Amino acid sequence: LKMSKSLGNVISPEEILKKYGADILRIWVAASNYAEDLRIDHKILEQHADAYRKLRNTFRYLLGNLNDELKEIDFTQIKIDSLPELEQFILHKLYNLNESFMKHFNSYNIHLIYKELLNFCTVDLSSFYFDIRKDTLYCDEKNSKKRKDCQLLLNIILDSLLKWFAPILSFTTEEIFKLLNKNDSEKSIHLKKLNVFPQSWHNTKLEQNWQRIIDIRNEVNSSIETMRAEKIIGSSLEANI
């Protein structure tokens, strides 16, 4: 869309702020490649608003399963070999994501940062890790090791996402950070340093193994959806693999 005052199709920042909020406008800026012509219309803004809702749902899930608490964790004290393989794989994902974040941040490719963070939240977390571990969080004994290990990961994920998203979702991350630090109004997410992840979290062999599992899982889910669409089964629980 080429905006022109003479055509009367200009979308003012004030209009965007009033309808969508400041962070949606910030997402539009962050998601745009400044090396190309910038495009904006209400359809594009609605797409960003939908992505924002998914991100808020990710934060809501993390907060709900951590009881609105965020603990300070010394990463060097984590015995990674004692964690389930799935948790080790997610730590590997976090390590790689942080490497990409620093690379893109230092080269001012903010749109690539946003793209990778959004993909991590919607694909790696919501559609994969959260989906697999929901039974553990909701059904296992409160103090079981498996559940505690999962909550450890959720704590690390929440802390990392708040710091990564702070330059983009400035108001949302501050709102969440204030919720987690009710007793200290002087604290701000924008004063926190980025995490430094141990090299031991990087595990290429583990990633290769889990990628095969993910490929099989995706194929199975695709077949299940086809069977549901054809009314062969009513629920995925009825499928035999």
Annotated model-derived regions:
Residues 40-48, 109, 146-154:
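Membrane-interfacial loop-to-helix junctions in multi-pass inner-membrane proteins
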Residues 49-52, 56, 91, 95, ...:
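Generic structural concept
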Residues 24-31, 59-62, 117-121, 129, ...:
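Short alpha-helical scaffolding segments that buttress acidic/His motifs in well-ordered protein cores
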Residues 68-99, 103, 131-223, 230-240:
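Acidic, turn-prone loop/beta-hairpin segments
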Residues 101, 105-112:
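Short helix-adjacent coil turns
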